[in-house]
Amino acid sequence: MILEIADIRITPGKQAEFDAAIQHGIETVASKAKGFKGFKVNKGVESPERYILMIYWETLENHTVDFRQGPLFPQWRAIVGPYFAAPQVVEHFTLVAKSA
């Protein structure tokens, strides 16, 4: 399993709108992608315009090819992209250890 972590900065003052938009985008678009396994979204306490989106994918290619190069990605960006204040930073991770 692959963990995608996206560090997102949104336009200040748009948090409530973005909260609804990202939930809607994941539930109606991203969750339909091949290999999508689940997600978490966290909002910054000290920086409330900063969000960390974590999406679990079956494989790296499910994100980088199937989703990013497929028909769902433009729909996703149309929902969440208008709120971005800067390009998001996205990286992928594999699990090393976890709690029980």
Regions found by a protein language model. Give the residues of each.
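Feature marks short, surface-exposed loop/turn motifs that line or immediately flank catalytic pockets
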Residues: 12-14, 45-47, 61
